[in-house]
Swiss-Prot record:
GO terms for biological process: photosynthesis. Coiled coil: none annotated. PSII is composed of 1 copy each of membrane proteins PsbA, PsbB, PsbC, PsbD, PsbE, PsbF, PsbH, PsbI, PsbJ, PsbK, PsbL, PsbM, PsbT, PsbX, PsbY, Psb30/Ycf12, peripheral proteins PsbO, CyanoQ (PsbQ), PsbU, PsbV and a large number of cofactors. It forms dimeric complexes. It is a single-pass membrane protein. One of the components of the core complex of photosystem II (PSII). PSII is a light-driven water:plastoquinone oxidoreductase that uses light energy to abstract electrons from H(2)O, generating O(2) and a proton gradient subsequently used for ATP formation. It consists of a core antenna complex that captures photons, and an electron transfer chain that converts photonic excitation into a charge separation. Belongs to the PsbJ family. This is Photosystem II reaction center protein J. InterPro entries: PSII_PsbJ, PSII_PsbJ_sf. The keyword rRNA-binding does not apply. SUPFAM superfamilies: Photosystem II reaction center protein J, PsbJ. It comes from Prochlorococcus marinus (strain NATL2A). NCBIfam families: PRK02565.1.
Length: 65
C-alpha cells in the first residue's frame, strides 16, 4: 500500500512535500466534459423549457382572453 493513500484508499490532496497531488488544471477537467459546461447547458435548457411554459400560459388554450 502506498504512503500517499488515506485510510479509505483514496489518494490525499497533498504530497508529502506540501505540493498539490493533482494540478489545478486537471482538477477541474477530469471527466469527459467539464462540470461547468454540463451545468451551464443544463441551466440553459431549464430556463428554455420554463420559458416555453410561460409563453404557453399567455397564448393558446390556457390564456384568459
Amino acid at each position: 500500500m502506498s504512503k500517499l493513500k488515506g485510510p479509505d484508499g483514496r489518494a490525499g490532496d497533498r504530497l508529502p512535500n506540501g505540493m498539490p497531488a493533482v494540478s489545478w488544471e486537471r482538477r477541474w477537467t477530469e471527466g469527459a466534459l467539464p462540470l461547468w459546461l454540463v451545468a451551464t447547458a443544463g441551466g440553459t435548457a431549464v430556463i428554455f423549457v420554463l420559458g416555453i411554459f410561460f409563453y404557453g400560459s399567455y397564448t393558446g388554450i390556457g390564456n384568459a382572453g
